């Protein structure tokens, strides 16, 4: 989206292809899952964002295949010719080939996934009040989170606050002490991308909030409502969250030889996929090893994607204007820092030489993320939700809702699943 914004006035026709008609703000997706904010507060319709742009076109479709020789992109609505193709489809959850975990674990990469997790959490609480056995009740009240990165830490903290501030009031006939939150990490510390001090502080915060943190544990399976570890230990649960890793989304038609670690496309210093004409990749989909400070590739975080988009927009304008490679600007990542919030008045922040923990870090986290949200209305909605939650000790969005798709939509989706699978590229 940043790339499309920065190409404004470049004399180019910009076509955005996405299977959803909205942009989402990933850093706050966990707050949807924990019933803290409404999905619409961090979701922004593309057509609304670009409605004043005469050079911009949006098509809701899935990219199916690309013919890099003919410069044709095959989508679920047909084929599209291109001069320059930029892949910015991000990443998906990596289950490391474990089919049982993929089938049963709940990921949290997208707004729909977060809404599904929220429904599951609330439904399990309702069921725990009426189930027939103590064994089932404990399975419903145990929450297992796999992955000790920022997402795992933040959702663990949010759920711990739900247990403390919401459950006793919304479910007065439930013994909230039966609710256990487990955070499983294969490594030896939380927030591995941050300093040891921040990792230790995050650990202390979560332990103080009652989260059971287990290091050096590798989850190998999920069977019979049990998370199974490599050492043979088990945790019974029906709420199994997997935030342990990601892999780049694939693009059929581009040979696997162009992929590197994490299935990311290998790109040069200008984000061109090596060996392909006019094809670029940015964000989580690319592996760029030309930056001296990041010889193994950049971290898969939003700031990298935003900065790459800005740099690529400048270079595309030059390329389209006939400039040669010497005029282009190589990408160098400017690390603006890392931060994670654990709960009320609890956060860790690292920005340059600044190291902050606790209340000030929490305020800084709030300000940074609030500024990053698109639109004044959305900023106000999120701010009001946060203020209400802070004053009342109460989350605001706790409805269980399941979307019902009209028959026409279901039939159209079924048709699209069996058409435009690449046959057009053979014509």
Place the predicted regions along the sequence by residue.
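A Rossmann-like FAD-binding core segment of flavoenzymes
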Residues: 54-65, 160-269, 273-275
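Cofactor-binding loop segments of dinucleotide-utilizing enzymes, especially the Rossmann-like FAD-
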Residues: 17-19, 89, 148, 186, ...
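C-terminal, flexible cofactor-proximal segment of oxidoreductases
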Residues: 313-427
């Amino acid at each position: 989206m940043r790339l499309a914004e920065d190409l404004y006035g470049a004399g180019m026709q910009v076509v955005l292809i996405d299977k959803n008609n909205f942009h989402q703000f990933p850093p706050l997706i966990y707050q949807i899952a924990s019933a803290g904010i409404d999905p619409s507060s961090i979701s922004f319709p593309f057509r609304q964002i670009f409605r004043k742009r005469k050079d911009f076109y949006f098509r809701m479709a899935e990219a199916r295949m690309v013919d890099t020789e003919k410069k044709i992109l095959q989508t679920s609505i047909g084929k599209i010719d291109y001069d320059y193709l930029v892949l910015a489809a991000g990443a998906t959850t990596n289950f490391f080939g474990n089919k049982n975990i993929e089938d049963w674990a709940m990921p949290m990469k997208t707004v729909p996934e977060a809404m599904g997790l929220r429904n599951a959490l609330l439904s399990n609480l309702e069921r725990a009040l009426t189930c027939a056995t103590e064994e089932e009740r404990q399975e419903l009240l145990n929450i297992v989170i796999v992955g000790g990165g920022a997402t795992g830490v933040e959702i663990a903290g949010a759920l711990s606050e739900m247990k403390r501030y919401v459950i006793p009031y919304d479910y007065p006939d439930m013994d909230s002490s039966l609710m256990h939150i487990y955070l499983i990490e294969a490594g030896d510390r939380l927030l591995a991308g941050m300093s040891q001090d921040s990792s230790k502080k995050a650990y202390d915060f979560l332990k103080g909030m009652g989260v059971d943190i287990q290091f050096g544990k590798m989850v190998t399976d999920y069977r019979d409502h049990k998370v199974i570890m490599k050492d043979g230990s088990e945790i019974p649960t029906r709420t199994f969250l997997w935030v342990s890793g990601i892999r780049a989304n694939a693009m059929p038609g581009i040979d696997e030889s162009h992929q590197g670690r994490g299935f990311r496309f290998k790109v040069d210093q200008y984000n061109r996929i090596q060996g392909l004409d006019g094809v670029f990749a940015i964000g989580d989909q690319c592996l760029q090893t030309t930056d001296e400070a990041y010889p193994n590739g950049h971290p898969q975080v939003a700031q990298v994607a935003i900065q790459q988009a800005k740099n690529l927009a400048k270079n595309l304008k030059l390329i389209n204007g006939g400039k040669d490679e010497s005029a282009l600007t190589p990408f160098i990542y400017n690390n603006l820092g890392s931060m994670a919030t654990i709960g009320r008045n609890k956060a860790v922040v690292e920005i340059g030489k600044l190291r902050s923990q606790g209340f000030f870090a929490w305020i800084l986290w709030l300000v940074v993320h609030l500024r990053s949200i698109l639109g004044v209305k959305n900023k106000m909605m999120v701010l009001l939700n946060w203020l209400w939650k802070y004053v009342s000790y109460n989350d605001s969005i706790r409805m269980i809702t399941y979307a019902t798709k009209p028959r026409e939509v279901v039939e159209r989706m079924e048709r699209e699943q069996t058409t435009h699978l690449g046959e057009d590229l053979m014509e």
